Amino acid sequence: MSASHKKPTPTELASDAHKNRRVVNTVNRPTRNTPYHDRTEAGECLAQEILLALSGGGPATSPGHRLKGTSPLARREPVVVLGLCRGGVPVARTVARLLRVPFDFLVVRKLASEANPELAIGALAECGRTDSGRDVGKKEVPQKRLRSDARRGQKPGEPAQESGLPPDLERTFGVIEVLNRDILAHLPDAEAALTSARDRETEELRRRVMRYRAGKAPERLEGRRVILVDDGAATGATMRAAIASARKQGAAEVIVALPVAPEEVCGELRHEADKVICPWTPAFFMSVGSHYTHFPQIEDEEICEVIQRQE
């Protein structure tokens, strides 16, 4: 038998099977089927799955165990974990703490009509600049379903309006928009509904950016491996906006990490992210909160407290 056709040893086969199983589990087949106690436990679970998926199936840490020394993820290339506001922030903070990598947040808002607040017609995400200083939130995005809109009421090509943000934050602030055109196509008076939702949510997004960032610019994403974390996803609308924002800011790789989401949503996100890590894809998905034992509403004060502790 030639060297090129050498039969693999049982140890090699087992190792390959383990690696393949773990990577598939974190994306396709769930490794969990019981509710999380809270967002902290969800973050602990995600930290283990992320480490397994991105470090070639190496040994996992036990729940709550913090890695010693430099994270194996950070040793390979620059990594940053971004929590989607508001529910994803405590989950992401736990992930970043356990993996010993930088943490930041991303303000996102769902776009919905006032007639049906649960129906996502799109989403917004804050979008800053690349390290080269290139503006990333004020131009048309050449991707399907994406359109950027840096200021309330601003149309593509129009001069930027004043945002009311502090000067340091103003230089990095923009908004990127993702639309669900399939839903908009069947929505009565869609343009009016979209305009109303866009104005309303852009104003709220700006308010949250001012409150949470307190005048400080966000982490630079250009050339970095970006891990986007939320506490779950029902439609994936805000996560798609987050992916678009990270891409536009020059992320080298975009990884989505969710504790729980429908398999259909994970499948859609796989077309836009480089990797999707989701340990629980229940067959019957009611809501994100129904898959937690303790799932309180996250208030502004809690977000600010998490951010201050990070500093």
Question: Each PLM stretch: what is its role?
Answer:
Residues 2-311:
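PRPP-associated nucleotide enzymes
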